[in-house]
Regions:
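Glycine-rich adenosyl-nucleotide cofactor-binding module
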Residues: 165-185
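Glycine-rich hexapeptide-repeat left-handed beta-helix
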Residues: 2-8, 14, 19-27, 35-58, ...
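Long, compositionally biased intrinsically disordered regions
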Residues: 111, 378-667
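Long, structured ligand/cofactor-binding scaffold of large enzymes
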Residues: 76, 85, 176, 193
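Long, charge-dense tracts
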Residues: 95-96, 100-102, 106-107, 112-122, ...
Length: 667
């Protein structure tokens, strides 16, 4: 016990000990039971004390559901080496509570055992074998783990110095946690629970009906409480603020990020789930689930793969085992990629960003440079439809819903999340994809009906449209960047315009990478990596700040990249650009935006076709069918997403007109 803690408490008086004994309380050594001044012994009943015990005041009552009130105190419990904060209620502990500090106004009822057994780091330092089930890409789990740090540890194994130094930084944090004494934060609620061993519990946590918790941290905070529910079993785990683990979920060697939900018997081992993941019913093994990885279905297995912004259809499955050297294979589905019902992928494979996988695929394609594609199966053959997802209203709906569904309320956010559908990361892939498709057509000939790429087949019509869709998206992104850059600029002379277009930073040139949610220039990421390797970064806090700064300055860096690509793609020197050239870019941007929006509008209209009404108006004629459909689904023109598309066309057209108006005097 610290000196400060001794000063706060005093020994029991003989009179207080007498009253406690009258209430069927006992102690191995009453001299080791200390209390705060103002202590009243009447609210302690049938309790045994051993080791050192420190008791706060019992002055408040707890109002429980059903109109029940319970006064704070100790009832039918056993405490060993425990400090109890003010106004706690601890009752009906079937076995004992040992080696814990319990925060004020916590409620603990009907539990079996809560103990710390020897020195522990409370789930920090657990090696999580992600991606490769047999090991080799272990991520060191700890309380403050971000998706980006985990990405370094799992993906950058070709830089052993980085891995070594990053682990060194993290172990510095972990070793500071090492203790033989645990904490239960203030206002925690723990009821009807089995065994809790070596678990650190944050303030305002709710643990109700949980079966067993072993070696972990529940990092609840007031602004973002953690909730654990009935029949949950967790071993070697960390659960971050704002997350909910419910109804029979079983976790082993897992990190759960902020604002995640796992429920309905979900089972996971050796997996990482970062911000806003939602997992129900299914199973995960050795997955790197970046932000917004979602699965709801009992028949879905996610294994040995990396995801983010992903939705898994029912029956989605993958294999990391070819029955030769064991489960050693892995896969990557880049941000926004998703699977349809009953899809299957035999790893290794790499699926491009914002692509959709349908059917069974066993030929190990690498399609990272063909984003926004459909990967479908026909007659046991993989067919690729490049770029088609750019005109899918579902893609736009996804992009709009992710920011709205960010449920993080903790002011300290672990993950830096970029929601942009079009970014230097995806546009550089489209530029590569356009080159690939153009070269395929040149080499195989324009008269070919089928083209082959990475063990996938591409129909001639799909290839032609894919080039067109990529060009539309490139025009849209580069035009958006240009218009945004000139927003609010008084176009008094072409020199003023040229000056406004000049990048304010040299950061942003070259390739960009997606660090599981954080989109950043590769050169800057490598600079951070080199600083870690050279021990220029002295602690985890400094590393996290560097990553946050990358995210904060995204748009400045984006413009540096866009500035280069505008010159390269259009063959324009922006230091000598004319008003006419800018106007041409704006017109091209506007026509591309409108064409894509019209494609989205047409795609949305399919959801209101006659075939979509099948099953409506079951006992009526076509008039009843249409009326029933409209009552349930609404009118096409009043649909939220349809209206947003039309509004987008109007807004972008007006934005283009406004800039053209400012440029008019210079033309």
């Amino acid at each position: 016990m610290s000196t400060a803690l001794h000063k706060e408490y005093r020994p029991l008086t003989a009179e207080e000990i007498s009253v406690l004994r009258e209430h069927a309380n006992s102690a191995d050594d009453w001299s080791q039971v200390w209390v705060k001044e103002g202590f009243v012994p009447r609210y302690i009943l049938n309790t045994h004390f051993s080791g050192w015990v420190r008791l706060g005041l019992f002055e408040k009552t707890f109002d429980l559901p059903g109109g029940i009130s319970k006064h704070s105190g100790l009832y039918y419990t056993y405490l060993h080496n425990v400090e109890v904060g003010d106004n706690c209620c601890i009752e009906h502990v079937n076995n004992y509570i040992a080696n814990y500090t319990i925060g004020e106004e916590s409620f603990i009822s009907n539990v079996d055992t809560i103990l710390v057994d020897g020195e522990t780091t409370f789930g920090n330092g657990v090696e999580v074998s992600v991606l490769n089930e047999t090991g080799g890409r272990e991520v060191l789990s700890y309380d403050q783990l971000s998706a980006h740090e985990a990405y370094f540890m799992a993906i950058y194994r070709h830089r052993p110095a980085l891995i070594s130094e990053l682990r060194h930084l993290i172990w510095g944090y972990i070793n500071a946690l090492r203790s033989a004494h645990g904490t239960i934060g203030a206002h925690a609620h723990i009821t009807d629970v089995g065994n809790i061993t070596n678990v650190k519990i944050g303030p305002y946590a709710s643990i109700v009906g949980t079966r067993r918790l072993y070696n972990g941290s529940i990092n609840s905070v007031k602004e973002a409480p953690v909730s654990l529910g009935y029949s949950v079993i967790c071993t070697d785990f960390i659960i971050s603020s704002g997350s909910s683990v419910q109804s029979g979920t079983a976790l082993s060697r897992c990190f759960i990020g902020q604002a995640c939900t796992l429920a309905h018997g979900y089972s996971a081992s050796d997996s990482l789930f970062f911000s806003n993941c939602h997992e129900e019913n299914g199973e995960a093994c050795a997955i790197f689930a970046g932000p917004f990885t979602v699965t709801h279905h009992k028949s879905t297995l996610l294994i040995a793969s990396q995801f983010s912004f992903m939705n898994a259809g029912s029956g989605s499955n993958q294999s990391n085992h070819m029955y030769k050297l064991g489960p050693i294979h892995q896969g990557i589905m880049e941000r926004g990629a998703k699977t349809s019902s009953d899809s299957y992928i035999l790893w290794p494979a790499r699926i491009g960003a914002f692509s959709l996988v349908m059917g069974r695929h066993t030929t190990h394609p690498d399609l990272s440079n063909l984003p926004f594609s459909y990967l479908i199966e026909s007659c046991d053959t993989t067919f690729l439809i490049p770029g088609v997802n750019l005109k899918s209203v579902g893609t736009i709906r996804d992009a709009q819903k992710w920011p709205r569904r960010d449920a993080r309320t903790d002011p300290h956010r672990l993950d830096q999340i970029n929601y942009n559908l079009l970014s230097p990361y995806t546009i550089q892939k489209m530029l590569n994809g356009r080159t690939i498709l153009t070269e395929l057509r040149r080499v195989a000939g324009v008269t070919s009906e089928i083209y082959s790429y990475q063990s996938a087949k591409i129909k001639a019509s799909s290839l032609r449209k894919g080039i067109h869709y990529y060009e539309l998206a490139i025009h849209k992104f580069l035009g958006n960047s240009l218009i945004k850059r000139l927003e609010g600029v008084a176009c008094t002379s072409i020199e003023v315009v040229r000056q406004a277009l000049q990048p304010r930073t040299s950061i942003g040139h070259g390739d960009w990478v997606d660090l599981s949610g954080l989109i950043a220039p590769k050169a800057e990421v490598l600079r951070i990596i080199e600083d870690i390797e050279m021990r220029s970064i002295e602690g985890i806090g400094e590393l996290q700040q560097r990553l946050a700064d990358l995210h904060l300055h995204y748009y400045e860096y984006e413009w540096t990249w866009a500035y280069d690509k505008i010159q390269e793609f259009y063959g324009i020197d922006l230091t000598e650009v004319t008003a006419e050239q800018i106007a041409e870019l704006v017109e091209r941007w506007r026509s591309s935006v409108v064409e894509l929006d019209r494609e989205l509008y047409a795609d949305a209209k399919k959801e209101f076709s006659l075939s979509a009404m099948t099953g409506f108006g079951a006992d009526g004629d076509e008039r009843v069918q249409a009326q029933d459909f409209e009552e349930v689904r609404g009118d096409f023109d009043s649909n939220t997403y349809v209206k947003s598309i039309l509004q987008h066309i109007e807004e972008k057209s007006a934005l283009g007109e406004e800039l053209l108006g400012r440029l008019a005097p210079l033309r």
